[in-house]
């Protein structure tokens, strides 16, 4: 599906009650958006387990943190298109910043950040009265050619969100790195260490959220 901004959206499962809108990471170079390997693997694993939840994946027009405003607009267009009664946003890496910036949209109850990048200049006031749950690999870090995000960085952003009025939980995953899966040269998905643990944590968070009445935390 092509969104109003020109970005793409693909949806797995029904969105009549619950939806998880998922955003990808990015890089410095301004390049055409791609589907997130980590999110794609996660959706493939969780959609059969959570048949009442719709999973909406966003493919940015340009996946670069130098074009954050463009990514924000793509995510807002996706939330508007999905328009489920209850929504969570899931952001991987740079997608954490995108999801947080979009959390003030109607129907959005919170954000799940997977190794989220939360820059100091990002306004986290959008999370006031909402939830921020962060899952981060203990071995994640910035390496040459690999734009990782350290747990210390995301923890700092998480604490800023808490101070701004967000409820939340922060979980470090021992043995995990930056992400859940990679796309192989032939197009298949190759899992990274502790992929199953990431999936189990996100599944438990979605079940907890769906079972909690709106506004009850």
What are these regions (language model features)?
Residues 2-52:
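Short, surface-exposed "cap/lid" segments of acyl-processing enzymes
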Residues 34-45, 141-168:
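Active-site-adjacent alpha-helix of alpha/beta-hydrolase-fold enzymes
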Residues 64-83, 198:
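Alpha/beta-hydrolase active-site loop
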Residues 90-99:
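Gly/Ala-rich beta-loop-alpha elbow adjacent to hydrolase catalytic centers
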Residues 128, 133-140:
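Short beta-strand/loop motif that positions the catalytic acidic residue
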């Amino acid at each position: 599906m092509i969104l109003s901004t020109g970005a793409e959206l693909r949806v797995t499962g029904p969105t009549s009650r619950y939806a998880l809108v998922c955003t990808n990471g990015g890089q410095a170079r301004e390049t055409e958006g791609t589907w997130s390997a980590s999110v794609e693997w996660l959706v493939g694993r969780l959609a059969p387990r959570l048949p009442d939840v719709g999973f909406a994946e966003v493919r940015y027009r340009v996946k670069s943190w130098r074009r954050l405003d463009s990514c924000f607009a793509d995510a807002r267009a996706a939330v508007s298109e999905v328009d489920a009664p209850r929504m969570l946003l899931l952001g991987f890496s740079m997608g954490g910043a995108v999801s947080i910036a979009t959390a003030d949209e109607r129907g959005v109850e919170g954000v799940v950040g997977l190794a989220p990048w939360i820059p100091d200049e990002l306004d986290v006031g959008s999370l006031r009265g909402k939830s921020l749950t962060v899952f981060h690999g203990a071995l994640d870090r910035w390496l040459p050619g690999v734009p990782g995000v350290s747990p210390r960085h995301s923890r700092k952003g998480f604490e800023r969100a808490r101070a701004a009025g967000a409820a939340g939980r922060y979980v470090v995953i021992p043995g995990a790195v930056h992400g859940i899966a990679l796309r192989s040269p032939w197009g298949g998905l190759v899992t990274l260490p502790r992929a199953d643990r990431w999936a189990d944590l996100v599944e438990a968070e979605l079940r907890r959220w769906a079972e909690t009445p709106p506004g009850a935390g």
